[in-house]
C-alpha cells in the first residue's frame, strides 16, 4: 500500500469516524438527560388536576409502565388512567382544578367493549353469563337435556324490573339441530332451557356407503350445545320458535343467518340408548364385610336394596350382621346370594316393626370361596322400605355392625337414605360475583361474596336450599367459606390468590363445586416518592409551628437571613403514592402467574392504606395525608406500610433529608380559563380508560377571568407542583405587562391572583412572582423566590377555531364547564406512535393534537449555561409544540434573579458521572485518531523511496497555479471540503484539479512524500487590503474573501528530510506551516525530523 492510498483511506474514513463520534455523543447526551430526569424526579410535568371517581363501588387509578412521561409532558394537560372494577350504576368522573370543575359520565361501551347485554337498558358492568349442563348423560327413556343459565355479577338486592334477555339454545348432531329457549328473570337472574333430543340421535352413527364406519364412543353419541342471546318481544317474552320435535331442522336453515346473534359454545352431552347400572357406593365395616348402596333420593313406598359382600380372603367361618333402623323405614327382607358357600338366617331374637335385624351367616364348607374370581363376592341382599316420613323431607339412617365369635365387633357404619317428594337431579351453588379482590390484606376489612345453593328438579323447577347444605374450601389459604355456607370470604390472613379455586357444596347425595378467582396484592408493595432526597430551599423562610423544630443556621447565611425570628427555611416537598399488582396463581401447578390487568399495569392503592402508613422517624420527615412528604430535619429514615392484622411491614422506602441547600431555578406558569375532559379506551388493556383534562387558555370576552397553575424546578433537577405546598408559606404576585390587554385581581378570597381580560391581544403578558410569607419578609425588601411569565391570548367572540369548553364568569360563582366533545368533530381511534405515525387520540383532543397558535407553552427562565429540564421534557416528548409561544428570555422581567448565586452552586457541584464518561469517551476517540495519524506518517517514511507512476507525476506539474480563498477570521473551517459553512462559502479555483494535488493542499498534520520529493513554498503569501469599502449588510459581497497566492516548487531531497514545509490549514489569520523552523540542510536523520514534526502535531 502506497502513501497515496493511505491518504485516500484517511480522506474516506475520517468523516465516518467523526460522524460516529458526534452521533454517539449525541445519543449519550440525550440518554443522560432522561436519566437525570428520572434520577431527580419521578413525576412528569402536568396540569395538577384532581380526579375523583363517583358512583363506583370499587375503582382504582392506574399506572402503566414507562408511560407517565410520554403522556404527561405539558403543563396544559393531565392524562390519568383508571379502572372501574365494580359498580352498580354508571360511574361519573370528576376533574377539578381551583374553581373549575367538570363531570362526565363514563360510557358503558368503554367499560364493556363486548357486552352481551348491550341491547338492554340496564347497566351491566361485571355481568357474566354462566351456563350449567344439568345432565351430561342422556338416555332414550328420558331424552331431555336441561341447561341452567345464571347472571354472575348482578346485585341480588336490586329488585328493579329489568328487561333481561332471552337465551336460545341449539343442539347440533351431524347435520341437524334442535332448539330450546328460556328468559332470564328473578332475583337471581336465572332460567332453565330444555331441549328434547330426537330418537334417531340415540342410535349408533349411520354408515354412508363409500366411507369408513365411524367408531363407537363408549360414552355415547356426542351432541354439541350452543346458545345465543337475543332480546325479548314487546311483552318481554321470548320470540316464538318452530317446534323441532319431529325430525329437527337442517343446521343453517331458517333462523340461522348472518344477522343472527353470535353463538357461544356451552359444552357436550352424550346420548345412550339404555342406561348403564348406576355406580354403587361402598361402606366398609371392616376388612371382611362391606355394605353397598345406590346414593339417590327416594320417595314414600320405595324399596332400597343393600347388597352385603364378603372378602375372598376372609378367614372367618361365622359372623353376625346387625342392621338397626329408626321410625320411617323398616327391613322387609333378607335374601341369600351365595347359598352354596354361606348359610344365611335371620334371627327371631328381636321382634317388632322397627326392631333391629340380626342376620347370622355360617360358611358351609372351607375353601368353597376359591371358585370366586373377584376380590369380594356378594353374600346376601337386605331390602329396606321407606315409609311416610314424619317431617318431609328428612334423612333416615341405617346403622350397621359385624360381630364375630368371642365378642369381637367392628366399628359402626352408617348409611343415609334421603327421603323427598321431589326428584332432584342437581344442586348448584351460585355466587353473586365471579371473583374476589382481596383488599383485606391491605385494610383488615373482610371481603365477602354472597352464595346461594339451589336445587333443580327433573321438570326444571328451581328452588333455593337453606338448610342441610355442607361446604368446604379446597384451600383456606386462598378463600374461606362461612359455617352456614351462605358466603365465601377473605379476611386478610390468606397467603396467596388463585384462579378457579374450588369450594365444594353438598346437599344429600348431590355435590357441586363453586369455582372463583381470588386476586391478592403482590407483596412487597411499591412506594413511589417523587423526590427521595429532600433539601432546604435557600431563601424560602416559613413560620415555625409549635411541633416543628427550627433548622439550624447555616454558616453561609448572612446576618439579614438570621433576622427573621420565628422563621426557618422551608424543606422540599415530595408526592407519595403506593402501587401494587393484583395477581393470582394458575389453577395447575407450574402455570404462569395471572395478572388482573397485565404485567405492565400497576394499581394505585394509596387511599386504601393511608391509615397504615408512617414515617419511622417523624422528627426527620413528616407524611401529610399519606400523600405529601415534607422534610423536617437532617437525617435518614423510611416510609413504612404496616399490616393491619399483624406486625409485618408490607413495604418500606428509604428517604434522606440533606443538609445541602437548593434554590428555585424555574417557575412554570400556566393560565387556566376553563377545563375540558375527554375519555378513551386504553390501547394496552380493554379494561383501562384514559381521561385527558385540558386547560383552556383563550379568553373570549371582556372581564373573563383565568386562574394560575404553577410548577417549580429546583437546582437539584426536581420538579414539583406548587399546589402541594401550604398556601400560608408563600404568596404569588402577578403583574400585567400590558394593562390594556389583561388586568390582575388580587382578591383575598382566592389564594392566588386572578387574571381578567380587558382587550384583545396575545403574548407573554403576565409576570408571576413567588414571594415568601408576609410574616417572614425582610424589613425593607421583598424576598422574591422565583419569577415566571405566562402566555395568554385574548380574542373576543372566537367560538370556532379553538374555543374554551367552559364558560367562565366570576370564579366564585360555581361554573358549569361543558365537555369539549360537544364542539369538536370526532376522529377515529389511532395508534400511539411518533408524530409521523399513528397515535391514539380521544374524540375531542388527543395528547399531541389541538395545540395550535392559541395554545401556549409555559415559559421558564433559563440560566446562562444551564439546560431547563422542563423544557427538555416538553420539547422531546411533544413534537407539535408551537415554538412562538416561548418569548425571548432576555426580555423577561426578573430573569436574572439569583443567577450569580445559582452559578456558584452549580460550579461547586463539579462534574457528574455522565459528563466524566463523555469526556473519557472523547479522549479515547482523540487518542485513536492520533495513533492513526502516527501510523500514516510511519507508513509514509517506510515507503519514501518508492516512485509514483508517470501519469501521477504529470498531475503535479501545475502546482504553482494553486489559488486559495480564505476569510479574514477563518481560512477553512473543515480541512476535508472547501465549502463547509452554510453562511460563508469558500471557493476553490480550478475544481477539476487532480485529486493528489488537492490532497496535498488540504493535508493538515502529516507530510506525504511522493517520489522522494517535497513541496516547498517559494513565494510569499499575500494578505487582504487593510482598508475595505463599506458595504450594506445585505450585500452579497459584505464578507470579503482573502485571496492567497502560493507557489510551490518540487525540490528533491536526497537525504530524505523534507526540504520545505507542508501547508497546514487552520483558523488563524495566516496560513501556518509545519516545521517552519527547519532549513533544508538541518535535518540529516529522518527520525529526528519526524520527532520534530510529531511535536508540532
From Swiss-Prot:
GO CC list: membrane
Record-annotated membrane-spanning stretches: 914-934
Membrane topology, Extracellular segments: 31-913
Cytoplasmic topological domain: 935-1097
Biased composition (Basic and acidic residues): 233-245
Annotated compartments: Membrane
PANTHER family: DETONATOR, ISOFORM E (PTHR13388), TRANSMEMBRANE PROTEIN 132D (PTHR13388:SF2)
Function statement: Regulates neuronal morphology via inhibition of the WAVE regulatory complex (WCR), a complex that controls F-actin cytoskeletal dynamics.
Family: Belongs to the TMEM132 family.
Protein name: Transmembrane protein 132D
Organism: Mus musculus (Mouse)
Lineage: Eukaryota, Metazoa, Chordata, Craniata, Vertebrata
